[in-house]
Amino acid sequence: MNMMQVMQSVVWAVLLWPCLVSLGVPLECKDEQGSIILCASISKEKLLDRVIQHAELIYRVSEESCTLFEEMFVPFPMRSQRNQAGYTCATKAFPIPGSKSEIQQISDKWLLHSVLILVQSWIEPLVYLQTTLDRYDDAPDTLLKKTKWVSEKLLSLEQGVVVLIRKMLDDDMLTTSYYEQGVAPYALQPEVLESVLRDYTLLSCFKKDAHKMETFLKLLKCRQTDKYSCFLH
Amino acid sequence: MLCFSLSQPRGKHKLNYTQFHPISKFVPSPHPRGLHISPNERFDPHHRWSHILCLVLCSSPCYFVSLLLYPSVQAPHLTGCKSREQETFRCWWSPGSFQNLTEPGALQIQYWKKNDLTKEWKECPDYSSSVKNECFFNKNNTVIWIKYCVRLHSESQNKTYDTLCFELQDIVHPDPPVALNWTLLNISRSGLNYDIMASWEPPPSADVSVGWLTLVYEVQYRRRNSSHWKVLEHEFGTQQSIYGLQTGEAYEVRVHCAMRAFNHFGEFSDVIFVHVPEIPNKESTFPVTLVLIFGAVGVAILLMLIIFSQQQRLMVILLPPVPAPKIKGIDPALLKNGKLDELNFILSGAGMGALHSYPPDLYQDVPWVEFIELDADEPEPGEKDNQSSDSQRLLGHNNHHTNHGCFHGLSIPDDDSGRASSYDPELPDQETLMLMAALLSCQPNKVEPCLGNCSHSSTPSLDVLEVPCPGLQAPDLPPEGGERHLVQTQLGGPQSWVNMDFYAQVSDVTPTGGVVLSPGQQVGAPENTPTTKKDKKGKMEGGEEESEEEEERRTNKLKFQLLVVAPEAGGYTTESSGRQMSTPDPSSPGEVYHTFPPPSAESKPHQEAYLPATTLLGDYQSPYILPDSPPAQFLPPVSDYTVVQDVDFQHSLLLNPPSPQRSPTCSPQPPSKPLPVMPIGYLTPDLLGNLSP
């Protein structure tokens, strides 16, 4: 997977060379492992823009995947879960404030760290989701492609956030997570309602967390450009 | 009852939705708590359609019956919850048609959040005063990414009529954009269509700048009287261009926005009207095309007129006549009828100055002592390429010549008695042949030096030769600079040979190989030596050859020999044979006439000496012609060269006109030519025709 990632990044680097020259270096910048070093130097602003782009894209694709899955597999009464108490997404290790005012008061460091934790917590479940979706008989190709794409982009987002943290917070203590192919925790048969709902829950929760990531990063960006107005509301 | 239940499926579901416990987690199970789903509905995504179908089928009779029996009964329910800016939200409910619940306060909105500590339903924080049945949650009570559940509850009856769960970001319906405006982009050339750019601003309530909300916009437009809105693609920016509107039509444009990726579009903005009046055509295309057509026709007519009126001139311009051959400054009439004397006069330069402006006499009294430097210049390529036959060349210079002096041993390697100064023994034979021809004519024109294969790089060019023809350069001309003016075309008209001395004798040969020349004879007896083919090898034999040649030159002043070079033969006549042949007696022209292969016996020793040299050049067959001088008429002293008088049937050249007693054996002479008079060397076409090939 890493090799693929590296290859992909190299190909993209070659193809987008003029863009890269003007915009900077792609996010895939692994200095510590002696792998392909594509980073020369990228400014914080450009890196942040790039990371935000990633987050936005991930969010959009996750929303599309959720909708696709809902249409295909989830029975009608259960859609949108309007009338249900709701599912519980996996709780995170840290509480995330809910209101906008509270969130705006969160420090930069906290924002970045929470983004990183969110990203890292979703890498493995998405891989699991991919394997589960493969077992569905009539899963549409687009759905599979989207989930695959999302899990890949999540990795690059993680790397970008790590670099961002290093640049903005001078925090060198973080390491990127290494994906290991884990055993699927649930071995239920696909297309049983339970598994369907579970997968649906997974997708919905991921969509929510993707939205969180995007929002945090955008708040961060706002602070970079105009600190005063960002704290005003 | 069936119709009633069918017509109100939602209420039915809600009525059964009583077992929900707010604290309990949702555990995926076939029958989720609080949601009654009939078994056959559970796995059937299309059960809604069956509902509708049944509704349709049963609606009319059942509905009216139910209406009669039961006035429309509708339970209280939540109509919806919406947020405008993701910071607050509102919920609305409807009390329904239940009679006992219409009074205010009978129904309450209760809610709870997932992260509440108490896990209890709370009362709506703010029942809005302005709008009926609305509950407003302000900023302090609003959290994002956390599940809310709102229920419609009746305390008195302790009954929940409806519940709704959501998260804040899922219920965002942004306000409509403001300041919608349009600007004209362009109008098509026909004036029928135009494009506009519609622009707007995000709703003020949405905090887009901070990034709290990311909006996507959708523009719709339609014709004034149409009912169908055309929807354009979602746009992330705040402007959108609309193409292809028609002038004269009124359009309506509106826009609404939604949170990105949630697709809950808010309300539409106010409609703006777009109208562009028709622009009358300033010009119609019809006259333009008419003008163009008329213009083209007029131009065509004009051209025709010009052509017809100026036909002659045009013909001359387009198809110029082939010029008749002529020599500059010479009347072509002269050339026709054999007025050779006049022609010669003219060509000698004494006539018009348009001819080659050589000073007429140069060499006559100039002592010629010079050293020839033999350079291996390559002859000019242009002159090498001339491959016309040698006989023709020579014949062009033939009989009418007296070959005084104009014939220098151009590349006559040996037997060059009487060779002119600056003679280059290295010249290839073809070149020498050419040169000889040129010299015969004694014209200061150029001659194509090569009759055959002239690619001997080692052989010096003709430059070295300085033919002291009249009008030639000074003796001090550097050999390589001598170039082609020495070599003259055979087209150069005949030259008067009389009283011209074109040649100089080689009086001595220096040890280094230089040739010392002495002035030639006063009488224009061209001195010549029989030539032979010469190549490198000949040059290599240089020294002794030189001495030999010089000696021969000295001695053999008379004879021109005609050498027809055959590949097997050496193709040259030695000095001795030349001597032998060079009798001043015109009465024995036959002896003068030699054609190879049969060389004379005396010449054999010499021939053998030179044979190897000559046989190397055996690949070309160009007859190597030495003009033979008709001795008696002009030259009391020795003359080495002879004018080719004729060509006999064997393709051999007759150097001297045969004596009358020998005439039968010789080819007929050109009838128009008096023998005693040395012909000028210009062979007119009619004369040539008399020569049998």
Curated annotation (Swiss-Prot), chain A:
GO MF term list: growth hormone activity; growth hormone receptor binding
Tissue specificity: Pituitary gland.
Pfam families attached to this UniProt entry: Hormone_1 (PF00103)
Subcellular location: Secreted
Oxidoreductase as UniProt keyword: no
Keyword list, A-Z: Disulfide bond, Hormone, Secreted, Signal
Residue runs in coiled coils: none
Primary subcellular site in the record, as a coarse category: secreted
Span of the signal peptide: 1-24
Cystine bridges: C29-C39, C89-C205, C222-C230
GO terms of biological process kind: animal organ development; growth hormone receptor signaling pathway; positive regulation of growth; positive regulation of receptor signaling pathway via JAK-STAT; response to nutrient levels
Cellular component, GO annotation: extracellular space
InterPro entries in alphabetical order: 4_helix_cytokine-like_core (IPR009079), Somatotropin/Prolactin (IPR001400), Somatotropin_CS (IPR018116)
PANTHER family in the record: SOMATOLACTIN ALPHA ISOFORM X1-RELATED, SOMATOTROPIN,PROLACTIN
Similarity remark: Belongs to the somatotropin/prolactin family.
Function comment: May be associated with ion regulation and reproduction.
Protein name as it appears in the record: Somatolactin
Top-level taxonomy: Eukaryota, Metazoa, Chordata, Craniata, Vertebrata
